[in-house]
Amino acid sequence: MYDKSRSNKVYGGYEKAPNRAFLKAMGLTDDDISKPLVGVAVAWNEAGPCNIHLLGLSQVVKEGIRELGGTPRTFTAPVLIDGIAMGSESMKYSLVSREVIANTVELTVNGHGYDGFVALGGCDKTQPGLMMSMARLNIPSVYMYGGTTLPGNFRGRDIAIGDVYEAVGAFSAGKITAEDLRIMEDNAIPGPGACGGLYTANTMAMLSEALGLSLPGSSAPPAVSSDRTKFAKETGRTLMKVMEIGLKPRDILTFEAFENGIALLMASGGSTNGVLHLLAIAHEAGVSLTLDDFDRISKKVPEIVNMKPGGDYVMADLYRVGGTPVILKKLLDRGLLHGDTITVTGKTMAQNLSEYKIPEFKHDHIVRDLSNPFLPSGGIRILKGSLAPEGSVVKLSASKIKYHRGPARVFNSEEEAFETVLKKKINEGDVVVIRYEGPKGGPGMREMLAVTSAIVGQGLGEKVALVTDGRFSGATRGLMVGHVAPEAAVGGPIALIRDGDTIVIDGEKGRLDVELSDQELKSRAKDWTPPEPRYKTGLLAQYAKLVTSSARGAVLV
């Protein structure tokens, strides 16, 4: 039996005849209204390719819902395309959109009394925003990813969008021609779907499987594949099954499920944004998760995946060898995954993986065995020290160097740093420090992809490091340390750094320090005054007042 108590409160009984009249105006019958009314939350717009196909997929999801006796109602959630906003003031709205998406789903689902919902996402912040709404509302719900784009092509080799960002730096350094840059621009994204490498979108899709919120194997199929369509229908059917047994997101999102997510994040070398978003989803689920949990698991889970930006392959390649379950099964077999966590199938993680058919051909060029990893520890490390007492995050899998000691070059905004990099005024050995770009200071904690890609494109990726209280795109590579907390806007040590101060990044020891005495830092702190808020009205001003530290997931309180 389905629980219709939520929709009955809005549409049931003679006194709700006016409410039902609105549904009948759209062609619904008494029989339709008597069934579970379920939402299909689609993060859709025409701003970019990541989500352009999701309305079509939502129709297939609705077919699956109808097959098992539900009445689906589609609604949209806002989308901000990070790749388009990147490197501009618009990027300040990116992380903000995560919270807006979660709020939008809550508003629509609770405002219309839906009995459950499917969440369908594509671009970077749509996915954590939707998963946060699932955890917050805690009614039967299932997540589905819209799929990745296929690899692009440049003179016969596969490329992804990260290659275009780096090409901007290469062009500014005279290493490629304007024609090369144009060809890459024209061919990097060949059609619908999210960015092809193991950037934030694909990272979050994989994590949805590890958490148990989406169907096994559903994260890897490209947007244009027939498997994507099959998963759409099965996702709709799965929602009705979940509703029948009364399974809710918080039954799935246990502490052990988040440990599974962290283990996959470390083994895959996924986006550092995965840290921020897992913390935020856990917050909504009422699960106590900290950076120490990431640090602990990172030390015992090797990185075994060879995907861009640190590696060679894209999500479509992982799909061909079996998808995310290939990685999860290796972790389970080694005892690095909790097999008893429940998932949206109603079965445990171990049961799902035992039933999933993995192609029987060689795949160690993309996914290695744990006995022969690409890195002996996780692809992401948590760094703490005098420059980041609460913590910071670095993606070691995307850097050939793990240690750097050098003089600080301090900038108070991304724009200042980017202009200096393009003018080739950054020297080998420098540590570029970009501050006042944190959750409160930006506000919005922008991703520094334009700057990091320009550094790499100029050939300085192994000779220069970067430290920021902002974030990084999943496409970032090089020794780039982000999420520095406390941030500059609240007087964190990063606010006290001056040009020429020596900064030490030690990825293997998990340290981020500035070579200054405690006495000197305290002296500088006395002279520091908080900057005026950059925004006095509007959404960004509201966000800056409510947002917490990146060490807590930059959630709102």
UniProtKB/Swiss-Prot annotation:
InterPro entries assigned: DHAD_IlvD/Edd, Dihydro-acid_dehy_C, DihydroxyA_deHydtase, DiOHA_6PGluconate_deHydtase_CS, ILV_EDD_C, ILV_EDD_N, IlvD/EDD_N
Binding site for [2Fe-2S] cluster: 50, 123, 195
Modification type N6-carboxylysine: residues: 125
Active-site residues, as the UniProt record annotates them: 473 (proton acceptor)
Record's catalysed reaction(s): (2R)-2,3-dihydroxy-3-methylbutanoate = 3-methyl-2-oxobutanoate + H2O; (2R,3R)-2,3-dihydroxy-3-methylpentanoate = (S)-3-methyl-2-oxopentanoate + H2O
Entry binding sites for Mg(2+): 82, 124-125, 447
The keyword Lyase is annotated on this UniProt entry: yes
Keywords: 2Fe-2S, Amino-acid biosynthesis, Branched-chain amino acid biosynthesis, Iron, Iron-sulfur, Lyase, Magnesium, Metal-binding
Keyword Transmembrane: no
Pathway in which the depicted protein is active: Amino-acid biosynthesis; L-isoleucine biosynthesis; L-isoleucine from 2-oxobutanoate: step 3/4; Amino-acid biosynthesis; L-valine biosynthesis; L-valine from pyruvate: step 3/4
One GO-annotated biological process of the protein: isoleucine biosynthetic process
Subunit structure: Homodimer.
PANTHER family on file: DIHYDROXY-ACID DEHYDRATASE DAD, DIHYDROXY-ACID DEHYDRATASE, MITOCHONDRIAL
Protein name as it appears in the record: Dihydroxy-acid dehydratase
Source organism phylogeny: Archaea, Thermoproteota, Thermoprotei, Sulfolobales, Sulfolobaceae
Gene assigned in the entry: ilvD
